[in-house]
Amino acid sequence: MTDRGDFAGQAALFTQDVVYDVSALGGGRLVGLATIREAALTLGDANPVAHHVTNIVLRETADGRVHAVSKGLGVMADGSTGSVTYEDTVERTPAGWRITHRVVRPRRTPLRD
């Protein structure tokens, strides 16, 4: 959805008041779908041309929410790539399951002993 600019479609993934924390990428905490849209449009050509999400692990919490951890791969227009970890809180809403909180953490250091 994001890659093709379908910002209205993001309501199928996120709550209207989602907290989208991209502080580790220098973007701060974005609150709400309108703020996420504006941030993406402000980035313009600096946006990835593709986002790929993989290795999704779900864990139900005692309060009925779901904690999701997944890997994200971003492909830039010049072909360079980056890797992040998404840490999501997912809650059941009247519209169905939606992400209420996301933290994006870049992976910049290789695994070492």
Question: Can you describe what each PLM-predicted range is?
Answer:
Residues 43-113:
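A beta-strand edge to alpha-helix "cap/lid" segment located at domain peripheries
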Residues 7-72:
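A solvent-exposed, acidic/Ser-Thr-rich amphipathic alpha-helical stretch
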Residues 5, 10, 82-86:
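Residue-level detection of beta-strand scaffold positions
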